Amino acid sequence: MDSIVGDAIDEAEAEDMGDESAQVDGAANINRSGTMTDDELKAVLKDLQTNITVVGCGGAGGNTVNRMHEEGIKGAKLVAANTDVQHLVEIGADTKILMGEQKTQGRGAGSLPQVGEEAALESQEEIYDAIEGSDMVFVTAGLGGGTGTGSAPVVAKAARESGALTIAIVTTPFTAEGEVRRTNAEAGLERLRDVSDTVIVVPNDRLLDAVGKLPVRQAFKVSDEVLMRSVKGITELITKPGLVNLDFADVKTVMERGGVAMIGLGESDSESKAQESVKSALRSPLLDVDISGANSALVNVTGGSDMSIEEAEGVVEEIYDRIDPDARIIWGTSVDDELEGMMRTMIVVTGVESPQIYGRNGEAQAHAEERLEDIDYVE
């Protein structure tokens, strides 16, 4: 299909039907007076490795971590944090945290964000231990419910205080989920904006353009898949070698204090796959925003071994033509042998304004800031 959202639908349908190299000495004692051996160079590289942690909060966040575990993502530690022990035991992760055991007895937060927040505060020590030493922390959750909405800001705050670049990637509820969940999502988003460098918002309502005819269960699986692909796309910009490499400093340039961001995902296997993949990303229902006003963009172009630098540059040129000429654009490109004859484009734009994001237009933003301290979760 033309977009990664469509690909995510295929993944959800398929799932529903089925119901390092040797260790070297540390770099500290390396002879730095001249030439270096391969082992010494590897040791330097190891010391410079970016430590990335992904923390999935609540049910949706846990599902994201589980999908990343299934995908075999490289270079990131996976942490699942939940108040529901039954859900937590089914998740594949490097570390699992049962938050608020005394508060909830492992029975969940009952769709109450205040309970999720208190549970996370009870388990702060375990949260700090899980993210210790991280250079970058992704906090992923579905906003509107109890555990994810309440705990994600607590986790993000801990990550930021530890010195990590903190990126939250969250979904907002389908309208059909009701006003209470929407109100709680708004409160959770405001809290996340206060404690994260960048918050990437994936509005579930926009997914309805692609999944409107799917059963509810599969629609939520598509949402989980999009979260996973978003985190994976940014992570592997740093961890996977590419034709045009990005490093942690590049990503930090765009994401540090980036504010609210949105993401576009697209792919194409046509003869004009470079142009079509970027157009698909820019048309993505998730990227419900005029990118001409964005202040920064992070672009990841992935293709098969047949992809040329010229094709990758064509993607970036298309974005340059549409964005503020003063905006900062950082891009990288990598090869995935499974994408022979195909190209995928991921665009993250920061400093955006969109009706899908609570409080982002001028008057609403000012009003939100005035009442921020009064915003609370609805029981």
Swiss-Prot record:
Tell me the keywords, alphabetical order: Cell cycle, Cell division, Cytoplasm, GTP-binding, Nucleotide-binding, Septation
Q: What happens when the gene is disrupted?
A: Viable, but have fewer colony-forming units compared to wild-type. Cells are very heterogeneously sized and misshapen, and have a notable amount of cellular debris. Defects in cell division. Loss or very weak Z2 ring formation. FtsZ1/FtsZ2 double deletion mutant cells show various division defects, including fragmentation, budding, polar tubulation and fission resulting in DNA-containing particles, which are able to remain viable and propagate without regular cell division.
Give the molecular function GO annotations: GTP binding; GTPase activity
GO annotations of cellular component type: cell division site; cytoplasm; cytoplasmic side of membrane
Q: Which example biological process does GO assign this protein?
A: protein polymerization
Location in or out of the cell:
Cytoplasm
Q: List the disulfide bonds.
A: none
Where are the annotated segments for Disordered? 1-25
Record: residues binding GTP: G59, A60, G61, G62, N63, G146, T147, G148, E177, R181, D224
- Name the domain of life: Archaea
Enumerate composition-biased segments (Acidic residues).
8-19
- Indicate the secretion signal residues: none
Q: Which family does it belong to?
A: Belongs to the FtsZ family.
Function of the protein: Essential cell division protein that forms a contractile ring structure (Z ring) at the future cell division site. The regulation of the ring assembly controls the timing and the location of cell division. One of the functions of the FtsZ ring is to recruit other cell division proteins to the septum to produce a new cell wall between the dividing cells. Binds GTP and shows GTPase activity, but only at high salt (2 M KCl) concentrations. Involved in division ring assembly directing the assembly, positioning and stabilization of FtsZ2 at the midcell envelope. Plays a role in defining cell shape.
Family annotation (PANTHER family)? CELL DIVISION PROTEIN FTSZ-RELATED, MITOCHONDRIAL DIVISION PROTEIN FSZA
Subunit structure as annotated in this protein's UniProt entry: Homodimer. Polymerizes to form a dynamic ring structure in a strictly GTP-dependent manner. Interacts directly with several other division proteins.
**What protein am I looking at?**
Cell division protein FtsZ 1
Identify the taxonomic lineage of the organism of origin. Answer: Archaea, Methanobacteriati, Methanobacteriota, Stenosarchaea group, Halobacteria
Gene symbol of the encoding locus: ftsZ1
